[in-house]
């Protein structure tokens, strides 16, 4: 079923070759377009841009505080939105990467304490959702703290 305004109907009535290309998975499918519009409305309603900036600052500052606490943290990267990475090293001066077993310990203990984090080589990657709350960030930072404390 399709609903069209009078002006659109006239185009089709006056031109037998007129058509609306839709139904493709990659271009202008009405259902996909409706979903995209609904997402934009929710993005504005939930203030995700402002939230991501505030929570990103919170995570970055929290990870920098952890770096002061643990020598195993060689660097904290991010500070521009929510994505943050923690470089794990066995020697800060040489930046020698941490061994895989220690990285796994940090990840597993963080998980046991309520945070699912990703390890990629010697890096702990944080990429929480845009709707993450201040309390969620506190839990995440506490769980990561526990992970580093276990090493």
Describe each region flagged by the PLM.
Residues 1-151:
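Conserved N-terminal phosphate-binding loop of PLP-dependent enzymes in the Aspartate aminotransferase
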